[in-house]
Amino acid sequence: MSVAVVGQGEVLAGIGRGRDVRVSAYVLRRGEAVVRALEGAARRGARVSVRLEGQPYADARGEMARGNRAVAKELRAFGASVTLAGARAEPVHMKAVLVDGIAYLDDRNFPSGGRDTIVATRDVRDVALVKAALDGNSGADGHLATEKAEALEFEATAIRDGPGDRVDVESEGFGFSPVSKALRERALGGAHVRLLVAAQELRHPGTEERRALAQLLDAGVTVRVGTTNEKLCVAGDRGWVGSANATFPEPILDWGMVVRSASVVDALRTAFERNWDEARPVALA
């Protein structure tokens, strides 16, 4: 298995030299580096295909949907093939770039700001899984899952089985799930558990997010809220990273990967500590 945490520059370079470039994202924004790289690849004759979500969740004003339509129009003008998942299509939440046998998986939507975690894998099983997912068929190979429900089970297992007495988790969205259950079990068992979630998830009182967080606070979990919106976990000598939010385990295309490489786990730990330091204690009252 060959998995490493990489910067966005490596993804852009891969797109820049690739002959066959396939992309899945929830949203992309005009002018961002990855969009410009895709335009350049299509312009020079590479085969570029992109799949975006056509009806993003919690998009009451339609801004994300309009943004995706604008990106689709722009990419098509350069010769790329773009699909917008509609009401009858399986939702697109997987963030992936597949270029000539290398899969780049992001826990966010390849933002230009760099506040994301990207893993690159050349493992033939991983690459085959990502390719199948981009074709609409989810699966798992023991450490990588391309369906949300399975990805969250992988994360929950890492939380339960991680050695030591510290568990750190970040998720943009949060609710009752295998992850919340595993966190509660570890906290009640005496582990020091920290959880970081997106502040925007707590805008409305009486939500599932608030109820799930209240239960964890009662169990002794330390909770903060922030704006980094990453999705990762560190538990002892193992970690997990993905684009799957720790919410209801739906059978949708997404991704999550368990990692044991010391360098990758260290990178996840560094990302968590940076995000944690910038966050603030949760206030549910």
Please describe what each predicted stretch is.
Residues 1-19, 24-163, 178-182, 189-264, ...:
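HKD-type phospholipase D/PLD-like phosphodiesterase module
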Residues 169-174:
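Long, repeat-rich segments with strong aromatic
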